[in-house]
Amino acid sequence: MKPKVRITNIAIKNFKNVNFGELSFVNNRKNFKASILGLYGQNGSGKTALIDALELLKYALCAMEVPDKFADFINVDSDSAEISYSFDIRLNETIYPVVYRLTLGREIVQVDGNAELFIEEESKYKVKILNEEFHCQTRTPDGKLRMGRMIDTKSTATVFVPVSKYELLVGRGKEISTDLLVSKKLSQKTAKTFVFSKDLLNAVRSNAANQNAGDEKKTETAHYLALLEALVEFGNIELFVINTANSGLISLNTQPLVFKIRSKENEAK
């Protein structure tokens, strides 16, 4: 059965004019299939910040380069911004809670040239991904399930921590470890996600395929891989974000593409 993904909560910290804000997407009062249908508030209340946070999620899940405009979205009183996304992922009629946390930073990018005055005038900020965390239900040594840290990329010496989860997902091969370290540094350099990168996903897929059939580790690795792939599919196929720039074009009816939908009955006439 195709996995179903729903965003259940977003927490924003030091992003645009929001020092801290949290929004639950779950409707607990009435048994509706839909949750949030609209977001209302006065000017400056953070409505656009939420849309920009969803746009950032789209870039992350699709492993696309985060535009430099997000460097300007970091609060002026902070060096970084943190956004946490909570999901419910349905796999085989079972719902698994998942949390993806993204920390953004910025650095000054200097244009080519060695003239001091020229550099000061033309310098601008470039966005960079400082850290990514992926939390889901993990199994403890006594067999119980609890929310735990699956992937944390803050370490510069290793691909990610905890080491036990790294060895479960990727294995202990030195060659793949070196390749992933290079991929991680390139992802950080180009402001792309590493958790949902093709290199890491392929490494997990390869490790899962090479594990012995019937092994508990193979089943566990396949489960975590299914969670990651469900989010990737959700970001590429199901998540659509229309920001203020796009909504303006739609309102003005100035989209470059014009199309008409005709029913089969009208075509028959």
Task: State the predicted function of each range.
Residues 51-112:
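Conserved P-loop NTP-binding catalytic core
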Residues 1-56:
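Pre-Walker A-like glycine/lysine-rich segment at the N-terminus of P-loop NTPase domains
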Residues 5, 18, 34, 78-82, ...:
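A general secondary-structure signal for short beta-strands and their flanking turns/coil
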Residues 105-266:
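Electropositive, glycine-dotted interaction segments
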Residues 10, 23, 83-85, 100-102, ...:
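Hydrophobic beta-strand residues in large extracellular and virion-surface proteins
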Residues 12-14, 85-93, 136, 263-265:
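Short acidic, glycine-rich loop/turn motifs
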Residues 16, 29-31, 91-93, 108, ...:
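Residues that cap or initiate secondary-structure elements
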